[in-house]
Every structure is written in structure tokens, then in C-alpha cells.
Amino acid sequence: MAAKEVKFSDDARTRMLRGVNILAHAVKVTLGPKGRNVVLEKSFGAPTVTKDGVSVAKEIELSDKFENMGAQMVKEVASQTSDVAGDGTTTATVLAQSILTEGLKAVAAGMNPMDLKRGIDKAVAAAVDEIHAMSVPCTDSNAIAQVGTISANADESIGKIIAEAMDKVGKEGVITVEDGSGLENQLDIVEGMQFDRGYLSPYFINNQQSMSAELENPFILINEKKISNIRELLPVLEGVAKAGRPLVIVAEDVEGEALATLVVNNMRGILKVAAVKAPGFGDRRKAMLEDIAVLTGGTVISEDIGLSLEKATLADLGTAKKVQITKENTTIIDGAGSSEAIQGRVAQIRKQIEDTTSDYDREKLQERLAKLAGGVAVIKVGAATEVEMKEKKARVEDALHATRAAVEEGIVPGGGVALIRALAKLRDLKGANHDQDVGISIARRAMEEPLRQIVANAGDEPSVVLNKVAEGAGNFGYNAATGEYGDMVAMGILDPAKVTRSALQNAASVASLMITTEAMVAEEPKEEAPMPGGMGGMGGMGDMM
């Protein structure tokens, strides 16, 4: 085992603070509408220019092990806030740096770190209650657009396109962000349920222009197993042919003579039919087939429930207004399932989302929920260069997370004002002893810091602006973009309550841990052996000529 280096008390905390300051100074310059750019070197290609706090934080790795530990802990604050609320990473970093700096001064002056932590926790709990109390539900698309605009560093086009996407697919709908091919952002809406499986044979195509199979008012057969024997299918095919309607088959696979017979029937015009593979794998495939069955009012033909293909009737088939199948995707539009059954299925998936601990499972469940509840919107980000594309895409994703957070927990006035108003409620808060009171005042001082930083980045005087905002009430604040004071909500400067709350809680949590740190252990740096010397010159060879 490699030898370890151990640092104690003040020495450890000072090294840790140095690392925190390096990271925080690099990140906090991006805060606010007048935030500055940070240029990140890439191992190949052009450097990346960004105003996204979490992108900057992720790039920072320090050579000193102890300083790096401090930087990594604050990086954790930023990424934790980003995971929970999708935004607020820079605010969280600014808060953590302030709490730690003031906290370590108090520890150096002889205060008890545990009492300081208790005081900070008490203040944060009271401030979070106040943030909840002042939050206003975010329902109209105008407010959603404003939240998106603020989060995307004052880019109105991003705010508008996110609001439009939410209008189209609903609050539960899936909104994905992709690289576009033009200069402008584009919004594509996929109506109905779409899954990533295409036709099993190109002979099913009936629309040569779009190279797709389009079936109006079809029956939909949903089968869990492979279909290779045509005899299994005959009863269903005869029933569908008599009804004179098209048929879509969704199964694990359709192969051999079964596929050949379907293709021949389709080409001769005896029966309009198309077959696709079932989406997903394993248990997720079963669940998705059940979703399709609920959406179309059909039944999954499965041995688990004692149903076989030979015994299936038209009553077991689902129906829809239209099914569109391309090489890669299948879209079911306007399924005939009852709204009660669909709502029941949606409620069941929501419960699974609440109970799951896996981020991957949660993402997949949310996709299934959206396909049942609303639809899918795709935002295609347009830009002139690849560097701009990456930066813009990161901002769109941030803004999307922020608007989701706003819909979830409501909105508060932005620009650091919510924390100033919450701070006013902490004036009468008292701890159990003097050291806890100092902890409370550390948290209060930190809550001023985001506003100070926004103002400093805009090139104004932080103390003057802070006093004027503190004298005001309600939504009164400072618009750093224009240099004016006024009602922040009326000016469209809003923050999701969830973002402000998460930033404060995560910053206080990690900063309190660092204040109560008494020892740090890291591997001793290895001394690199010098490179061996090269071979000497081979003098005297000239005489051999």
C-alpha cells in the first residue's frame, strides 16, 4: 500500500479552502445576465467557450491532492444541485464558498464547529420554509418561457421554444434535445405513441414518397412471442379480411413462412398488413406491450394469461386512427383505448417513478409515461459552428430542467431576491448558544452572496445594490441586464423555487461537512525518476575512412 500524507485541523482546512476558492472563482464569474465567459481547453480541436457553471466545475482538477479534495467536494454541490433541480449550480457554488470561508474564520477564532453546523442547519431550514411560502405556481406559458430564458443566460429564443414544446406535449410530455442541421432552433412534435422499431420488410411500404407504411383505422395485434408458423395467424387474418380493415402486427419477431405469407398478401392487395418488432427487451418489453395494449384498447396475446394466437379473436385486437411505420420508427396515432384505462396505467407508472431508486429506470419510466400521457417533442438546436452547438445545447438542457423544476414547485423572484427576502425572516432566529448564533449569521451572510456576485459581474457596486434591494419588499429587486430596479416578476426575472431551495440546502450540507473536518488523508506524491541519459557520441569514427 502506498504511503499516505495526513494533514490536521487548520493546516487541512486551509488547504481545502484554497481548492474551494480556485474552483469557485472560476465558476462564479458566469453568474447572472452579465456573466463572463470561461474558455475550456480540449484535448483535441478548438477550445469550448461556456457560461455554464457546471461545465466549468467538471473541468477543474488540481495538482495538490488536498486542494483538489476541497474542489471536488464543491463540485459535488454543483452536480448534486444540477441532478435534483437541473440548474442553480453556480448559485450553489457561490453559497458553499461563502459559508465555508466565514465558517473557517469562526473556527479559527475558537468557535465550536458542531455548534456552527447546528446554527447553519437551523437557518437553512427556516429559509427553505420561507422560499416555499413565497413560491407562486408556474402554469402559464409566458412564465415558463421567462424561466427558460433566464436559465439559458437570457436567450429568449430558447425560453420560447421550451414553452411551445410544453404547450404541445403537456407538462408530463417527453422533450428531448438533439443537434439540428440549420442555424435556427427547430421544434418537432411527435403525436401519439412512437417507439424505435421499423417495418420488418420493405415490401410493407405503401407510401413511396415518404418510404413508409401508412395504415388508416387498422386492427393491431400485440403478440409477446415470435410468429413463424402462418397456421397460428390464420384465424386472426381471416377475421380481419372479413372486416375489410388493415392489420398491424407487433410481435417479438415475425419470420419464415409467416412473414413471406404476409408480404405476398400485402403485395396482391388481399390484405393490407404491416409487421414490426416489439420495442424494448425483457421485462421492459412486456411493460411496453402492455402500454400499447392499453392505448389501443387491445389485449397482449401472452401465454402468461393463457391466451394463444390460435384462440385470438377480433375482440383481442387493438385499434387506432392511424399507424405510420418508417424504416426506424413506428407511430400509433389516436389509439382507441378508454381514457379510464389510460389514466389508470399512467397512475401506475407514476407510482413506479416515485418508488424507483435507479436514474436509468426513472428516465425510461418517464418516457413511457410521456408516450401514454402526452407525446414527444424534439428540440433541434441550430448553430453556425460545432463549438457554438455544444455550448447552446448545454444551455437548452439547463433551461429545460429549470422549467420542469418551476412547474413542479413554483417560481420565486429571481436575481438573488428570493434569498434576500428569506434572509429578512431570519433576523429574529436565535440558536441555543452563542456559537449557534454565529452559525445563523454565517448562513445569513452567505444568502447575500449570489446577489453581490450578480451585481459584481455586471460591473456595479454590490453593497449599494444590496442595501437598496434589502430596503424594498416583495418582488422588488435589481435587473442586472438593464441596471434598473423594479418588480422582478413583472420584468420576467424568475427562478424556480426548487432550484433556489436545492442550491441553499446542498451548499450548506457540504460546507458544514468541510467546517467540521479535522483531518485529511491523501497519497504522498510519487517522486518521478529522472529519464536515463542518452548514449554518448561515437567519436573518432572519421579515422576509419
UniProtKB/Swiss-Prot annotation:
Binding site for ATP: 30-33, 51, 87-91, 415, 479-481, 495
Any one GO cellular component localisation term in the record: cytoplasm
UniProt entry tagged with the keyword Isomerase: yes
GO MF assignments: ATP binding; ATP-dependent protein folding chaperone; isomerase activity; unfolded protein binding
Pfam families given in the database record: Cpn60_TCP1 (PF00118)
GO biological process assignments: protein refolding
Location of this chain's protein in the cell: Cytoplasm
EC number: 5.6.1.7
Catalytic reaction annotation: ATP + H2O + a folded polypeptide = ADP + phosphate + an unfolded polypeptide
Keywords in alphabetical order: ATP-binding, Chaperone, Cytoplasm, Isomerase, Nucleotide-binding
Family: Belongs to the chaperonin (HSP60) family.
Chain's role: Together with its co-chaperonin GroES, plays an essential role in assisting protein folding. The GroEL-GroES system forms a nano-cage that allows encapsulation of the non-native substrate proteins and provides a physical environment optimized to promote and accelerate protein folding.
Subunit composition and interactions: Forms a cylinder of 14 subunits composed of two heptameric rings stacked back-to-back. Interacts with the co-chaperonin GroES.
This protein's name: Chaperonin GroEL 1
Gene, per the UniProt record: groEL1
